[in-house]
């Protein structure tokens, strides 16, 4: 065998340039970059060194042979020609990985079988002994890549992927692979910062991958020093003495590195369930003396190194997966930006994000950006110098002013910490930092919100209302409905039509979400966002979240429970406020029937108004339980019936009479507990006829729905005394949207 070998090193997409620099520094020659890989030439010592020291590679492949290939037979004979007895015992184990397609092979499993067959046939002994397949821990892992008619046959020297360092046995929901984390640290300048004695802090550390990789770099620990089994361990070409020499050198370097004064490396994680797994990972890496992890929110993040040294803040914020995550992610980035500006002045920061647009919401400019891939997700690494000239705040500076600031950076005096009488540091007064500046669109949106607040202010105060709609798609480009619930904000985003560029729609949403807390003077953690779109099947009733957090609100002398997070609607239709108040005024001494009752808020008002009895019918057990809580909250119980059932079937079976009936049906509904599908336009006549049959003489039926295209059937107007009262049932906060609902008063003709 030759003294030099062709090597292929694979890596995550986007790391090729960094890996080429690292591999060249470790001795690889004639280095060339490919997609998700590099190649070069090296002797065996360099090949071993790459396995041991590469922080960025996935695998180190030693090329055995290249050969042209036209079909499966060429593949078989090309592999068969290799002197496999120089590489593997006849009773050894193999695993074959095949990549690429063409030359008559479009199935990688078939290609791998042909490679395996050739190796087995070559090594089969006269007495029938032959290699067997072990896909988990083989003696030899063989890789064949088919590239434009050429087969490249290699041995995998690494065995399992090199990103598996052995310390991370516990991980969070969205982990970074260790070699990607190392690449981000290298791009962020951590090797330089660590060599200068700088600190590192991760405000969203998860299970500590950034922390451990940073500690290994700072302590000069080979990333794979603890690996016991390699792809070359049972390879007949392995040179154990050479490997032991390199491994002993790495052990000596690690011992010397750990003997140094430890770098100040700290992680903070809001989820208490991840704290112990993170500490366990750190302990397995042997870095417990270097790295500490604490529970803490981003909003209170403040790194306090022992020697007041500056350093690097690095983090990988979570990716939004659930409906409504946009708001929480936006405010997370805003909080991060605020903490950087307030607590990390003159530090460097590196934010690895799958949502680069959110990175613009931190209120700090990035001076460099790098593209990476986290699996199949394109990501950006934003590098930031946390200095005042990079802050994006309310004050707009000219390019000339920014140039002056760059040429004359602000000097920040480092003040020695004062201690209290117990010898503990006295926490300094927080630095006052301006809020991040809203975009032009965001400021325009904020102005509209404040204008609406001012216009409704007198009415709100006069009526004693603190739950009302402050914005309802007033500006077409900001298609939101925004409701105030005292000191909470409930935001519903109307799904953008397909003709709207998704990136523009997302940017406008972020502009609006950034503006809402400032314009309404509301804590950003009390903003809840949902997306409202056409629902199908039972989705209109499905749970969106599972927080189970109910708020108590008051209206017209009654108390009601709302839930802003768990369902698409909150349990209280604000637009029906006037209708509920009308029912309360008219209910005294009457038998009240509430059909499609939802959470029975109208029944609570009827009971408050002195109704002789209330009966509420709904198909959902969840909403009826909610209704029971609403009634109990107000001390109403015995005379108020709650029945689960299909309204149409219930009306057909019921023979009781009612003096006051309220019907507010959905546009459509289907369920396993009902026959067929209810459609309000189609079924209105049958529904109202059935309800009118239950109306006592002199009684009143109120019918309402929010189907914008609804047309009341003319037969109903001929049969009953029908009055359109829509205008009387819409308050000032919904006056901008006259089609929010339609309402009619229906009575028997005299």
UniProtKB/Swiss-Prot annotation:
Main location class: cytoplasm
Annotated GO CC locations: cytoplasm
CDD domains membership: AdoMet_MTases, THUMP_AdoMetMT
Cellular localisation: Cytoplasm
E.C. number: 2.1.1.173, 2.1.1.264
Catalysis performed (reactions): guanosine(2445) in 23S rRNA + S-adenosyl-L-methionine = N(2)-methylguanosine(2445) in 23S rRNA + S-adenosyl-L-homocysteine + H(+); guanosine(2069) in 23S rRNA + S-adenosyl-L-methionine = N(2)-methylguanosine(2069) in 23S rRNA + S-adenosyl-L-homocysteine + H(+)
Keywords: Cytoplasm, Methyltransferase, RNA-binding, rRNA processing, S-adenosyl-L-methionine, Transferase
NCBIfam families per record: PRK11783.1
Function of the protein: Specifically methylates the guanine in position 2445 (m2G2445) and the guanine in position 2069 (m7G2069) of 23S rRNA.
Name of protein: Ribosomal RNA large subunit methyltransferase K/L
Species of origin: Pseudomonas savastanoi pv. phaseolicola (strain 1448A / Race 6)
